[in-house]
């Protein structure tokens, strides 16, 4: 997902495109079709050099989920996580 399309998706949801929001969406796009936990999203952002905290990732994922931009698959245990809503 290009940075421009990520920014469009965020603006369509009424959100300002921040480094954390853009990073979370790009990580979820690159992991598709696999779901990622919040910790896995944080690890991927850390490896990419994106300066965000675990708390920020948790807040961003919760906000994006509430607005329908990402979806929590609701499964328990392994395989539980967040997916980019198509």
Where are these regions (language model features)?
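Intrinsically disordered, low-complexity serine/threonine- and proline-rich regulatory segments
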Residues: 1-31
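Flexible coil/turn residues that form the inter-helical turn or adjacent wing/linker of helix-turn-helix
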Residues: 34, 50
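A short acidic, leucine-rich amphipathic alpha-helix
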Residues: 40-42, 46
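Short, hydrophobic-biased segments on the C-terminal half of alpha helices
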Residues: 58-62
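A short, conserved structural fragment
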Residues: 65-74
